Curated annotation (Swiss-Prot):
Family annotation (SUPFAM superfamilies): RING/U-box, TRAF domain-like
Protein location: Cytoplasm
Transmembrane annotation, as ranges: none
UniProt xrefs under InterPro entries: Sina-like_RING (IPR049548), ZFTRAF1 (IPR039338), Znf_RING (IPR001841), Znf_RING/FYVE/PHD (IPR013083), Znf_TRAF (IPR001293)
Name assigned to this protein: Zinc finger TRAF-type-containing protein 1-B
GO cellular component, one term: nucleus
Organism for this UniProt entry: Xenopus laevis (African clawed frog)
Gene: zftraf1-b
Renumbered zinc finger spans (RING-type): 72-117
Subunit structure: Interacts with LGALS3.
Chief location bin: cytoplasm
Region named Disordered: 1-56
Length: 365
């Protein structure tokens, strides 16, 4: 294969074996190094390609470049709340910052920045308000209309302004189950049949709604009762993704060890109850188990529940679970993580980590 070089140099000589004719592109004004051109060796070859020492100007938008600059050094996501920085300026979202401090406390080590290994603590690190404001101005897509808005305005747009946001009929109180985009609401309400139903028909619907309301009140009353217990503990937990060692690996999640009620615990989670190919299912669920790692002198009966953490917006319906932990029986069964639907589950799976808050209530005999 012939090689044509307009000017000898190490850049051109290193292109041997690429299966293409090589030349160099003229740079206007003679400034800077010449750029290497790869031309197809015959008419049936692939389209023309150019190797650039850097991307074409304007090929990557500014906001896309800023994502990698302003992301958290730990989870690599854009922070959703406060942004902290180490003494060398490396950025951490509030959730990861708290977890670094908690992990160091459990290991009896000094917490360090994952980038530069300088010491970090609540007194050594400070918030970076400039970065927080910059992130709030970065564009983000509305999940309903797919238009872009600054992050600071997105929540208001989704709740109050978006014409495609999911809304409910005003006759929901008398049993209308309709849900749809906001721009169809007026047409539906003008045609809704519920206002014309008889009293007897409405009574049946209202009875069903009363039963649902009664179950919700039982849950909240149970939570209020648990809050009166003597021994209550809570902590922020971070589920991190791992893969099994099987021939066909499976995704699972596990938290670092944490301490609640003077005991050491671990949480594990799995997708679709570890079914063989969860990627082929349109329905996504997460289930979790609580594991007691420390030894206990007597059976330890506990109630526990997971809620959304302070730095995330995942939608979870609280469910109270109960278990008696002993040295021989220290793992609960896998129980459902009460996410409202598969869409919310996919949001969690798409994130680098899953941040939640765990409450444990010890039942005294």
């Amino acid at each position: 294969m012939s090689e044509e070089r307009e000017a000898p140099g190490p850049l051109a000589s290193s292109s041997a074996g690429l299966g293409a004719e090589v030349g160099q592109e003229e740079v206007p004004g003679g400034a800077g190094p010449a750029r290497l051109l790869l031309l197809p060796s015959d008419s049936d070859g692939p389209p023309k390609k150019r190797l650039r020492s850097e991307a074409e100007p304007g090929s990557v938008r500014l906001e896309e470049r800023l994502y990698s600059v302003l992301c958290c050094a730990v989870c690599l996501d854009l922070p959703k709340a406060s942004v902290y920085q180490c003494t060398n300026g490396h950025l951490m979202c509030a959730g990861c910052f708290i977890h670094l401090l908690a992990d160091a406390r459990l290991k009896e080590e000094q917490a360090t920045c994952p980038n530069c290994r300088c010491e970090i603590s609540k007194s050594l690190c400070c918030r970076n308000l400039a970065v927080e404001k910059a992130i709030s101005e970065l564009p983000s897509d509305c999940g309903f209309c797919l238009k872009q808005f600054p992050r600071s305005l997105l929540e208001r747009h989704k709740k109050e302004e978006c014409q495609d946001r999911v809304t409910q009929c005003k006759y929901k109180r008398i049993g209308c189950p309709w849900q749809g985009p906001y721009h169809e609401l007026t047409v539906h309400e003008s045609e809704c049949c519920h206002p014309t139903k008889t009293g007897n028909e409405l009574m049946e619907i209202l009875d069903e709604m009363d039963q649902t309301h009664k179950k919700e009140m039982q849950l909240y009353n149970s939570i209020f009762s648990l809050l009166s217990f003597e021994k209550i503990g809570y902590t922020e937990v971070q589920f991190r993704p791992y893969r099994t060692d099987d021939f066909i690996t499976r995704l699972y999640y596990e938290t670092p060890r944490f301490t609640v009620l003077n005991q050491t615990w671990v949480l594990k989670a799995r997708v679709n109850d570890s079914e063989r190919n969860p990627n082929l299912s349109c329905k996504r669920t997460l289930s979790f188990q609580l594991i007691l790692k420390s030894k206990v002198n007597s059976p330890m009966e506990c109630s526990f529940l997971l809620l959304k953490g302070p730095y995330d917006d995942v939608k979870i319906h609280p469910v109270i679970y109960q278990f008696v932990f002993t040295n021989e029986n220290n793992e609960t069964e896998y129980v459902p993580l009460p996410i409202i639907d598969s869409v919310e589950c996919n949001k969690l799976l798409a994130a680098k980590n899953i941040n939640l808050r765990l409450f444990i209530f010890q039942i005294q005999k």
